[in-house]
Amino acid sequence: MVSVQTIATIVVKTFKIVLNIIILVLYRTGYNGEFLGVGGTWNLNEEKNPDAEIVASGVIVGYLIYTLVQIVTFLFGTTEHKRALSEIVMNFVGVFLWIAVGAVALHYWGGYQGEHQFQFVFAEKQVGLAVGALCVINGAIYLLDTALSVIHFTKEM
């Protein structure tokens, strides 16, 4: 019999995958079909920081792959993966990484000024703020998944 925690975990992981794909598409094509990025420079008159972009790309793509692998293991129906401490650690670290990437994006795009300095609404700014907000929301979902992972881990002990 499948437990309620297992079903909840599969639903949460599926939602994380969908949200992660949305973030990835916006991150990659949010600037009128071109690369949007998260910014990551503290001087808003400069170009985007490549270090922040590398970390953001790693978090977005890395956690997409990790979550896909985790959901595949759940779909196999075995219980071995539920006893693994690695899922708790990865989800816990994911909370901080997603919130950090979202905070950098919100900081950069919140102060963004486009080419026309007296225009206040820019499509890329709105998409950048959406990416930042979605990353923070994804961090909260990873916190929920961390709690579910702890429940699985303690229940199986």
Swiss-Prot record:
Cytoplasmic compartment residues: 2-6, 75-87, 152-157
One cellular component (GO) term of this entry: apicolateral plasma membrane
Tissue: Expressed in midgut epithelium (at protein level).
Membrane topology: Multi-pass membrane protein
UniProt keyword terms in alphabetical order: Cell junction, Cell membrane, Membrane, Transmembrane, Transmembrane helix
Segments passing through the bilayer: 7-27, 54-74, 88-108, 131-151
Protein name: Protein snakeskin
Extracellular side: 28-53, 109-130
One GO BP: septate junction assembly
Protein location: Apicolateral cell membrane; Cell junction, Septate junction
Its job: Required for assembly of smooth septate junctions (sSJs). May be important for barrier function of the midgut epithelium.
Organism (species): Bombyx mori (Silk moth)
